[in-house]
Amino acid sequence: MIINEVIINEVIINGVINKYVINLDNCIERMNNFDDTFIRWRAIPREEVDEYTDKKLITYYNVSREYHLGCCACLLSHITLWKHIIDNKINNVLILEDDAVFNKEEFDEEVIFNFNNNGILYLGGFFHTIKMVQKKDKLIIPNSINGINFLDKNNTRILMTISYYIPNYKIAELMYNTIINLKRWRVLDSLMYHIPINNYYYYPAIFIENNQYESNIRKNKKKYPNKYYTFDRK
């Protein structure tokens, strides 16, 4: 797999982690779970999905219209934030979805801030097979050490966009341009695997998904990622 080399020396590290929470207007109360160091980024609701995105993004034939538009809205919410990062040359960016909850008593910003590799650092999600539709026994669970691990994308991918860290705006630019220039779109976490850049993950996961909230995309959700990048059932 070709990995794009981003020249980190071209960007200036600004000394802080810029923490964004993607949050829908009708779930504004979820922001109470985050302190004032987190910046709210307004999530795009289904009702505001444009026709271009609606047609460009492909979902399975048997999913509901509501689910399809939810996937569209999720993708738009993330990539508009990436565009904001690029336009304003923002570095050291932590992106959370509003159902993310800490798996640690304290958030160790120093460990995350010192991550300055040419890639994306996942702080939560779950391991998945390379192919989206593949038998579970084909899943390769990587051997992980505590802290930051390199993910071999030839064997395993990480799904979900609940929490990830972008060290500089040049990487955000690569992510944005890759997605924008695709002829067709899928759900965002699936597309991110195809961005030509290294993937890393923090183990155990710093953020897991709050199973007390109803998913804004998939109703009656039963499986939630845990700190080991596998699933717990509700």
Q: What is the predicted role of each segment?
A:
Residues 2-6, 10-96, 100-234:
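An acidic/histidine-cluster motif and surrounding catalytic segment
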